[in-house]
């Protein structure tokens, strides 16, 4: 529902990071901040507590992060607090990473298989996907024993299901339809 907002915030920060030549630094620092909020019980309570005022949350963030992160990154966090969007920081990072890949003409292909693909299979898959999408492909491989065999590939909203499990599912649907 809020993907559009997440993208707008991420794009605004990306443009600032790009101007400053600090894209990777901002992404890494934001990930560390998400981990800090998640793992520090006291900070997590402050961020999640609805009765702690926005100004109090902003003051706490300034105390923690001033001098430790870039001023413009801190300003971004304070805007998120002001707009009550700080709880969705992880989504902003995800969108910022997507924007970064888009700017570099890259796509991430999430690949699932029962056994790990060998280098030749990986390269063949990368070559075919690069040709299809006209972009540089980054493979993220995951093992999934429930697939029985074959390969499942997801790039954004596109899915290529070449698994035995997927074929069985297609057959089951056809049989149930008749």
From Swiss-Prot:
Q: Keyword Lipid metabolism on this protein? A: no
UniProt topology in membrane: Peripheral membrane protein
For this protein, the record's InterPro entries field holds: ATP_synth_OSCP/delta_N_sf, ATPase_OSCP/d_CS, ATPase_OSCP/dsu
- The reply on keyword Transport is yes
Protein keywords: ATP synthesis, Cell membrane, CF(1), Hydrogen ion transport, Ion transport, Membrane, Transport
One Gene Ontology MF term: proton-transporting ATP synthase activity, rotational mechanism
Give the source's domain of life in one word: Bacteria
Q: Where in the cell is it found?
A: Cell membrane
Q: A GO CC term? A: plasma membrane
Q: Name one Pfam family in it.
A: OSCP
What does the UniProt function comment say about this protein?
A: F(1)F(0) ATP synthase produces ATP from ADP in the presence of a proton or sodium gradient. F-type ATPases consist of two structural domains, F(1) containing the extramembraneous catalytic core and F(0) containing the membrane proton channel, linked together by a central stalk and a peripheral stalk. During catalysis, ATP synthesis in the catalytic domain of F(1) is coupled via a rotary mechanism of the central stalk subunits to proton translocation.
Assembly: F-type ATPases have 2 components, F(1) - the catalytic core - and F(0) - the membrane proton channel. F(1) has five subunits: alpha(3), beta(3), gamma(1), delta(1), epsilon(1). F(0) has three main subunits: a(1), b(2) and c(10-14). The alpha and beta chains form an alternating ring which encloses part of the gamma chain. F(1) is attached to F(0) by a central stalk formed by the gamma and epsilon chains, while a peripheral stalk is formed by the delta and b chains.
What does the sequence similarity comment in the record state about its family?
A: Belongs to the ATPase delta chain family.
Q: What is this protein called?
A: ATP synthase subunit delta
Record lineage: Bacteria, Bacillati, Bacillota, Clostridia, Eubacteriales
Q: Which gene encodes it?
A: atpH
């Amino acid at each position: 529902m809020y993907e559009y907002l997440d993208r707008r915030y991420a794009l605004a920060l990306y443009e600032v990071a790009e101007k400053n030549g600090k894209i990777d630094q901002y992404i890494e620092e934001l990930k560390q901040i998400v981990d800090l909020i998640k793992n520090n019980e006291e900070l997590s309570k402050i961020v999640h507590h609805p009765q702690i005022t926005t100004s109090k949350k902003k003051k706490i963030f300034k105390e923690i992060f001033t001098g430790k992160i870039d001023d413009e990154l801190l300003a971004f966090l304070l805007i998120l607090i002001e707009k009550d969007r700080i709880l969705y920081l992880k989504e902003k990072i995800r969108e910022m990473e997507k924007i970064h890949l888009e700017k570099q003409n890259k796509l991430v292909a999430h690949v699932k298989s029962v056994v790990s693909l060998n280098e030749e299979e990986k390269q063949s898959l990368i070559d075919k996907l690069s040709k299809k999408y006209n972009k540089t492909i980054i493979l993220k491989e995951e093992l999934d024993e429930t697939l029985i065999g074959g390969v499942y590939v997801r790039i954004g909203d596109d899915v290529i299901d070449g698994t035995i499990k997927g074929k069985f599912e297609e057959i089951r649907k056809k049989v149930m339809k008749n």
